[in-house]
Amino acid sequence: MTPAPEHVHIPSRDGLPLAALVLPPGTGPGVGTAPGVVVLHGYGSHKENHVDFAERLAGAGMWALVPDLRGHGETGGDMNAGMIDDVLACLDHLDERGAAALGLRGSSMGGFLSLVTAPMHPKVRALVALCPARPAPLAARIGRDWPLGHPLEPATWRADGVARGFWHARGDEVVPWQNTFTLASRAAQPKHLRIEMGGNHRSLQHDPRIQAETALFLADHLGAEPRAPR
């Protein structure tokens, strides 16, 4: 049985406390050094929407940390460029718990943040981006100036050894799948791209098959070992 998530508050790099859930990997030798993955929600969402995937990661032998980014859920503050620091602080937290390698999995805005922040932390070895948002359309959707002007291309196309997985639903009504196809086509190896027929902007997040595929991608590239439930 997967244990109940641990509720924690993690100080972001500017001091803002981030509400988050942490799920440990199963029992067995080397639990402390098991890989860890930060799971990032999209705009207007919150951590509870992604507990199902966090449980899958824990079952696959990885730490899972799901935060409420600033301006979302139980975390205060305004949604601004400090979200980059939020992600890095969550990665630092898993590092402090002893995770040997780190990964990211983000959906929509969380996918954008995963792609942008991956090169900023030395222990990130893999990421999964589901229907990743682009800066300009996200700003238009929010209806005000989008504070994160980081271009995706330089971060995504780096030949830095980080494994980048891209999943996108062809029926996405918010972010065109062609955006992700273009990003992935020029990304360095190792990488993986899957364009799913049908679906919508949120359909891949909770699809059991996609969850299994993305958890396996992360486990393979982070060196996770399946563990007995706690």
Describe the residue ranges of each PLM region:
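Short beta-strand/loop motif that positions the catalytic acidic residue
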Residues: 159-161, 166-168, 172
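The serine-hydrolase catalytic nucleophile loop
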Residues: 43-55, 178
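Short alpha-helix in the alpha/beta-hydrolase fold that links the catalytic acid
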Residues: 176-185
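Alpha/beta-hydrolase active-site loop
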Residues: 49, 78-97
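Catalytic histidine-centered segment of alpha/beta-hydrolase-like enzymes
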Residues: 199-209
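Conserved alpha/beta-hydrolase
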Residues: 57-74
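Primarily recognizes the serine-hydrolase "nucleophile elbow" in alpha/beta-hydrolase
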Residues: 90-150
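N-terminal cap/lid segment of alpha/beta-hydrolase-fold proteins
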Residues: 1-29
